[in-house]
Amino acid sequence: MTDNVQDEIKNIVDQNDVVLFMKGTKGQPQCGFSNAVVNTLSFMNVDYKDVNILESDELRQGIKDFTNWPTIPQLYIKGEFIGGCDIILDMHKSGELASVFDTKGITHD
């Protein structure tokens, strides 16, 4: 991963409270896993930045290298990598995701 892509990813994560690196956009997810996380965040009424990793091969590989996590989507809250689809869905079902949002001061339903 080039330093430019790593810096770009770090800036996005640092400058936004909640970021979802995903395939597609929140208005038009391009895979079922991204769609599931979008639906979860929408259900919780969380404001977040979506980043379409399909726009660039370098970004698509770069985000995987950035976290050393092989799959997309990837959710960040206040600069902390939280996880991918299965983790987010499990955290939502258990109430842990709401607790993380509360702890980090993120507004949600």
Regions found by a protein language model. Give the residues of each.
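Thiol-based oxidoreductase modules, predominantly thioredoxin-like and allied folds used
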Residues: S42-G62
